[in-house]
């Protein structure tokens, strides 16, 4: 078996590492650099440039130089985040025939997976040159908050690059692996990962070679690119005030501004003032114009303060989901180039109440972790168990449009969980299983991932058939759902495909909506529960009345029928309290009928179980079969 490499496919830079004996080693590229810019360019004559050569010519070829394409991977063209990106990049973002966001140069379109594949190919070639052998297997990292579509698109990129992707792992988890492997560390750590395009925070417990993720949170559209653009807009605004020319309308000038902004941002991490000097940035009738400006660290920090503050809330949510306070975190590990910014380090220190750990290289630690995971899969690294989590709850729609969770967010993967459901109608011979992902109480408020039908259920009264629905999530976070009729053994299953994935804006919207609408969700859930209970009560009372109505006197029979009529009327509305009140009235009125049925059963000599039909729809038995395997 050949070497398995670890690749950090970053928004701004990528890095490749491999196990060398008992430790992981970062491999230098052909230009002698330990990281490679995640940039792809198409030249005038159609040549493809990747990495540093592509970055060097970006100023003279802005429309055919693709950067930060990772932010488009697995996204639909009509995604609000794509709309935002279109105004920030000089290259064209177009709508593909499948509705995804692709990029275009000289009339030729490329999917984000393709562009990412060009970068992965460069990583592959770098590793092959160093190892002197062919490499065809890799572990690739993704942001922890990446959804199914984005994970699948990343796997596709690996395939296009000629790599079999053995495992997709989360970036903060990889960083924790690199941080904790060679140290006899035990405790709870927080990984704060602010990279070029994404932000993740993960809380992990480390001990005896086990790396267990307790919770994860993040924002997949927050990173260094946003800090750069904030500075670009400031420089452009200042120049426009002075010269009356908007540099953002000139793609070449915009690219020069972007490079200058990135350089100034980096310099201000180690110095308190820098000078931005861009001669001949543009020209008008009076001649050439130059941009010269001094920028202090304080001014830059003021420009991006809200971006830094946006990282605080995901950290608090991750702590809450893990059931921990900031004081219970033993170490905070910084990952991603943006964590070199003093303001970011200051915010992390304030939030967690301790100095963040700076002993790892924030640009390389993720690739090193990926290489360690590759070593685990290859058998070169022993006694390491990696347990990651799924970022969003998964479940199905049950009677009344309720979202019934089968796997909660932050559940350790790989995992397999089942629940038993039943039918809502008498003699129902098929059920439609609709699979959703999200945090809201009602299915319609969440994202539908897919649906399938389970056919051939034998005729039976409602509530009698037992249909077992099973969710199976593998170590890559890829979902399988199956439904099985326990009586016949008939089974159907669905694999959630890339087209069923969520956009990050949808994920964030779901969580934020869930918090904002928690009270409303609870009220709607209560109304549906009351309706389901009332429906079952109406059904069982009607059946009992038809079979045993003659055993009660006329006045009691009439009061039962009146109560039935009132409850049916209440069921036409959504007033949970009214439905509950009418249900109680019917239950009281039906007591004499129950007594008559019980007496008859006693007289028959075999006391039978009464009220067998009073089944609450969508009641279930939970089967919890968490599989904690080596990731």
UniProtKB/Swiss-Prot annotation:
Source species, domain of life: Bacteria
Residues annotated with Phosphothreonine modification: 198
CDD domains, per the entry: ASKHA_NBD_HSP70_HSPA9 (cd11733)
Spans annotated as Disordered: 602-631
Key words, A-Z: ATP-binding, Chaperone, Nucleotide-binding, Phosphoprotein, Stress response
Induction or repression: By stress conditions e.g. heat shock.
GO molecular function: ATP binding; ATP-dependent protein folding chaperone; unfolded protein binding
Key word Chaperone present: yes
Record-stated family: Belongs to the heat shock protein 70 family.
Function, as annotated: Acts as a chaperone.
NCBIfam families: PRK00290.1, PRK05183.1, prok_dnaK
Protein name: Chaperone protein DnaK
UniProt source species: Rhodopseudomonas palustris (strain TIE-1)
């Amino acid at each position: 078996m050949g070497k398995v490499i670890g690749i950090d496919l970053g928004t701004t830079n990528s890095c490749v590492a491999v196990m060398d004996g008992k430790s992981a080693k970062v491999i230098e590229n052909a230009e002698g650099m330990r990281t490679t810019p995640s940039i792809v360019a198409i030249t005038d004559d159609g040549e493809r440039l990747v990495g540093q050569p592509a970055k060097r010519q970006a100023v003279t070829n802005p429309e055919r130089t693709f950067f930060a394409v990772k932010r488009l991977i697995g996204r639909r063209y009509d995604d609000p985040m794509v709309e935002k990106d279109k105004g920030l990049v000089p290259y064209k973002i177009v709508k593909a025939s499948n509705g995804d966001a692709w990029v275009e140069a000289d009339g030729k379109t490329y999917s984000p997976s393709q562009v990412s594949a060009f970068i992965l190919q460069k990583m592959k070639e770098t590793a092959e040159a160093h190892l002197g052998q062919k490499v065809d297997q890799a572990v690739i990292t993704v942001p922890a908050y990446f959804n199914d579509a984005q994970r699948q698109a990343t796997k596709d990129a690996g395939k296009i690059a000629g790599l079999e992707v053995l495992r997709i792992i989360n970036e903060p988890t990889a960083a924790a692996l690199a941080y904790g492997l060679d140290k006899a560390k035990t405790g709870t750590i927080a990984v704060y990962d602010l990279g070029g395009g994404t932000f993740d925070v993960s809380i992990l417990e480390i001990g005896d070679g086990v790396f267990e993720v307790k919770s994860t949170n993040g924002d997949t559209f927050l990173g260094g690119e946003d800090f750069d653009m904030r500075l670009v807009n400031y420089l452009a605004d200042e120049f426009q005030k002075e010269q009356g020319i908007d540099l953002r309308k000139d793609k070449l000038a915009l690219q020069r501004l972007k490079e200058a902004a990135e350089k100034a941002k980096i310099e201000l991490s180690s110095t308190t003032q820098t000078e931005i000097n861009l001669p001949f940035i543009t020209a008008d009738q009076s001649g050439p114009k130059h941009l010269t400006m001094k920028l202090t660290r304080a001014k830059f920090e003021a420009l991006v303060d809200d971006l830094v503050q946006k990282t605080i809330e995901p950290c608090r949510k991750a702590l809450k989901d893990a059931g921990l306070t900031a004081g219970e975190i033993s170490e905070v590990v910084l990952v991603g180039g943006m964590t070199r910014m003093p303001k970011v380090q200051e915010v992390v220190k304030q939030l967690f109440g301790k100095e963040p750990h700076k002993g790892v290289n924030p640009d390389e630690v993720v690739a090193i972790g990926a290489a360690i995971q590759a070593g685990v899969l290859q058998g070169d690294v022993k006694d390491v168990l990696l347990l990651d989590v799924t970022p969003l709850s998964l479940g199905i729609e049950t009677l009344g449009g309720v979202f019934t969770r089968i796997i909660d967010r932050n559940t350790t993967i790989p995992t397999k969980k089942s629940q038993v459901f039943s039918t809502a109608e008498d003699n129902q011979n098929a059920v439609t299983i609709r699979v959703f992902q999200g945090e809201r109480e009602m299915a319609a408020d969440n994202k539908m991932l897919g649906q399938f039908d389970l056919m051939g259920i034998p005729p039976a009264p409602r509530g009698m058939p037992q249909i077992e629905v099973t969710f199976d999530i593998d170590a890559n976070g890829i979902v399988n759902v199956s439904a099985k009729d326990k009586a016949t053994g008939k089974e159907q299953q669905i694999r959630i495909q890339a087209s069923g994935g969520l956009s990050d804006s949808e994920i964030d919207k779901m969580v934020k909506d869930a918090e904002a609408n928690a009270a409303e969700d609870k009220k709607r859930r209560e109304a549906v529960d009351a309706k389901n209970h009332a429906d079952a009560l109406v059904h069982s009372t009607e059946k009992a009345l038809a079979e045993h109505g003659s055993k009660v006197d006329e006045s009691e029979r009439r009061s039962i029928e009146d109560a039935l009529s009132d409850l049916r009327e209440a069921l036409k509305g959504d007033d949970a309290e009214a439905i509950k009140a009418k249900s109680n009235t019917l239950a009281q009125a039906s007591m004499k009928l129950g007594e008559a049925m019980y007496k008859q059963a006693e007289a028959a000599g075999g006391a039978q179980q009464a009220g067998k039909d009073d089944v609450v729809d969508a009641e279930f038995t939970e089967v919890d079969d968490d599989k904690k395997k080596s990731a």
